[in-house]
Amino acid sequence: MSNSMNGSNAKKRSSRPKEYDVFLKIVLVGRSYVGKSSLMIRFIDGTFNDFYVNTIGVDFRFKTIMVKDRKVKVQIWDTAGQEKFRTITSTYYKGADAILLVYDITNRESFDDINNYWIHEIEKNGSEVQNLILIGNKADYAAGIPEARL
């Protein structure tokens, strides 16, 4: 019997502090310019950037948060909204705990895309994903609502 199956190695591994209790993979999808990257950066860094930078392919970030005394490591995948990257985007649905469907409330077409394209893509390529969350973004642009009231 090798040492890896008993005693010494197992003890070394278990003595290391756990990095997290729960791991969540979240994927952001939606048309270009709806604010997916801004949502991710706001959650991860707590900052907002007025300048738009296209996501090329995908970007991902991690953040560890505490929820009810449990350390949760959140991995957020920010996918490109441009059509030329949509086939790449669908490969990231696998293993996702949630997919956030993001639209711009000032752009009706971005909302229509959710039902006309994104839902079908998720059903076709990510059928095991149970948690679909619809996010209407850019409320501050639509009504001039101060950030403090959001």
What are these language model-derived features?
Residues N3, S8-V29, Y33, S38-G46, ...:
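Ras-like small GTPase catalytic G-domain
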